[in-house]
Amino acid sequence: RRIYPEAIIVHEGHIKNGNVVPSHSHEIVKSLENGKLIMTNQRYVSTPGGWHSWPCSTLTTVLMASDEDIGLILTGTILGATFLQSGIKYWDRFRASSWHGPTGNFWSSAFRLVGVPLFSPVGGSSEFLTMQAALPLIEQNQVVYCMEKDGGACRKCTKCLRRELIRTVIDSQFEPKWDTFDSPSIHAFLEKRPMFMGHIYSYAYSTHSESLPTWMTSRIQDLQKINTDWPMKQLDQSFDFVDEKWRNDLLKKINDFYQSMTIEEFNEMKTWGE
């Protein structure tokens, strides 16, 4: 919404056992002039529920493509997923394009082949950057990332913990509240190696350890160190994976928000997980 305000926003409201799963995001999307809220049971059509593969989350948009004249589907998949295997180890997507097609991902390449390109413009941006761009909306309670407590944030899960950590890094006015996260399940998560989205915790420890509770720092201080600011920079080369027809306009707009990684920063990112 902040970087590409002209884009149509398609959001699925989930139906489970005949009932709508509560989410604060429903009212937010309905209030947007370019918002499309679609109710569907596709995520819970089987038992156990869940996406059968990640492209299923875009199915509604694909079905709407003709009626809405959608020429490109933008997703919000971030750097940790596109290049870092959920923050565990660097994945050379550029090299993978030799066997996964021009996008470096066989699903995205398939979408491109059938004429409805699928691309994440924040695929070269960490969650630090995406939250930084969304901060004005977050302050207006216009961003939903956890729905476990009556459709809103539970402030107990690992996703909520990561959001608290990220905002501590990018928002100097933010006062984090850590008490609800000091639990055996969170401790176990922090101790597990390799660590899910470990680069987020490593960078936060490197730059803001004084703002973190000791029960957290004692469990993440052994993570691989990050010496440059690559988690706070955008990887421009990620736009190599979108068709030239869209590339320049998409990249120009994201560069209005983010600084680009230097070669030194990109090279350090490539060592993550070694």
Residue spans for each PLM region:
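Nucleotide-activated chemistry modules centered on ATP-dependent adenylation/adenylyltransferase
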Residues: 2-274
